[in-house]
Amino acid sequence: MGLPWYRVHTVVLNDPGRLLSVHIMHTALVAGWAGSMALYELAVFDPSDPVLDPMWRQGMFVIPFMTRLGITNSWGGWSITGGTVTNPGIWSYEGVAGAHIVFSGLCFLAAIWHWVYWDLEIFCDERTGKPSLDLPKIFGIHLFLSGVACFGFGAFHVTGLYGPGIWVSDPYGLTGKVQPVNPAWGVEGFDPFVPGGIASHHIAAGTLGILAGLFHLSVRPPQRLYKGLRMGNIETVLSSSIAAVFFAAFVVAGTMWYGSATTPIELFGPTRYQWDQGYFQQEIYRRVSAGLAENQSLSEAWSKIPEKLAFYDYIGNNPAKGGLFRAGSMDNGDGIAVGWLGHPIFRDKEGRELFVRRMPTFFETFPVVLVDGDGIVRADVPFRRAESKYSVEQVGVTVEFYGGELNGVSYSDPATVKKYARRAQLGEIFELDRATLKSDGVFRSSPRGWFTFGHASFALLFFFGHIWHGARTLFRDVFAGIDPDLDAQVEFGAFQKLGDPTTKRQAA
């Protein structure tokens, strides 16, 4: 046929049987990738430390999606929350992966069958005997079935009525677990961080989809609307489907990057805005202040800070710190976190407590500046020592650790103080193992960053695809050069341009 690569899909334009076949094959490829990727991730995933080496630090991409839907156990005997399990059941991580691969194989066989047996009676118009699809009816069927699935997910799976529920956590990502969720029917259901909104919105959207599907199955579109929206053209279906997909991709890119109940930080890592706003730092200071108010010592108050909370307050877990084209997991960047060294408190020789100014997200280097409680600069690590007034040596800065592995340890040696001041720019200080994975010390993004970049990019691409195919559908007659209102009988070959009497061919 000699079609260029970008026109090869025209072979299924007027062939409903093979159009169905290629879509089934596409589903086979998607399901096959999902199952294979899950098995690969399970082969390389280390579940031994869910606090300091969680799935998102290891670069897991499909495991978080399985987990948020209620899968927590492995046939390997481990649980995602730590500990061991003796009876994980069929719906373990491996079970879900296997189900996708089996489903992929069945779809592969079905695609081949439909490619071979393409000329089925169901695709033929009874009146003309030619291949034809009743697209408005098919739209109604799909809308009804997707509505049933949507309603079922919200009413049964999420609520735990028939299913495990979903992953639910506290605002600081400390107590996450899979649990049933009650629908939130009040205004709180519109809060993107309220899990109940997931149940209620699926129930509401599913109900609407079922009703809309039944409507489109029982009511035929008016002739003027049918012609105006080109409802008889398969490219209209392509255009509107692309619109639905790019809209969904933009939405999920937003919920992933800005955070929501559907993208828990325990599964996908924290958002960049939590670093920008000092979200975890504020909660840590609130807990320490509460401890001091209960007459605890500084050491006791800091020792009660969960290591998990301290780890979130570290810039290496900020998804915006990794370049988009730096391949590999976060562990391949700054290393595998081994332990929290504790919270460093700096003081000058007059006893004032000093705070290291933290590095903003989009800086690779940042001056080391220590300020007092009023924000006045008291010490720094100068670029030019000859002109320095506030150097650590001149000001006599010391550092003492509270909580963590170095609890109670203090340093007055300027070189050591400066080392920890530099590290305090990056948030809480952790011991990182860079030897095991030969980590290069350059920050990487988390799966939250990859997902957002991928979906935003494809959404933009699909937006242009929607415009392209929509225009081709609506203006097909213009592009073809045929007047749609032409009702005269035209003899093919009589004119150089079809239907244009001014281009009548001259007799040879």
UniProtKB/Swiss-Prot annotation:
Comment on bound cofactor: Binds multiple chlorophylls. PSII binds additional chlorophylls, carotenoids and specific lipids.
Localization: Plastid, Chloroplast thylakoid membrane
Membrane topology recorded in Swiss-Prot or TrEMBL: Multi-pass membrane protein
Recorded GO CC terms: chloroplast thylakoid membrane; photosystem II
Keywords attached to this entry: Chlorophyll, Chloroplast, Chromophore, Membrane, Photosynthesis, Photosystem II, Plastid, Thylakoid, Transmembrane, Transmembrane helix
Disulfide-bond pairs as recorded: none
Transmembrane segments: 21-36, 101-115, 140-156, 203-218, 237-252, 457-472
Molecular-function GO terms, alphabetical: chlorophyll binding; electron transporter, transferring electrons within the cyclic electron transport pathway of photosynthesis activity
Pfam families associated with the record: PSII (PF00421)
Record GO biological process: photosynthetic electron transport in photosystem II
Record family assignment: Belongs to the PsbB/PsbC family. PsbB subfamily.
Role: One of the components of the core complex of photosystem II (PSII). It binds chlorophyll and helps catalyze the primary light-induced photochemical processes of PSII. PSII is a light-driven water:plastoquinone oxidoreductase, using light energy to abstract electrons from H(2)O, generating O(2) and a proton gradient subsequently used for ATP formation.
Assembly information from the UniProt record: PSII is composed of 1 copy each of membrane proteins PsbA, PsbB, PsbC, PsbD, PsbE, PsbF, PsbH, PsbI, PsbJ, PsbK, PsbL, PsbM, PsbT, PsbX, PsbY, PsbZ, Psb30/Ycf12, at least 3 peripheral proteins of the oxygen-evolving complex and a large number of cofactors. It forms dimeric complexes.
Protein name (Swiss-Prot/TrEMBL): Photosystem II CP47 reaction center protein
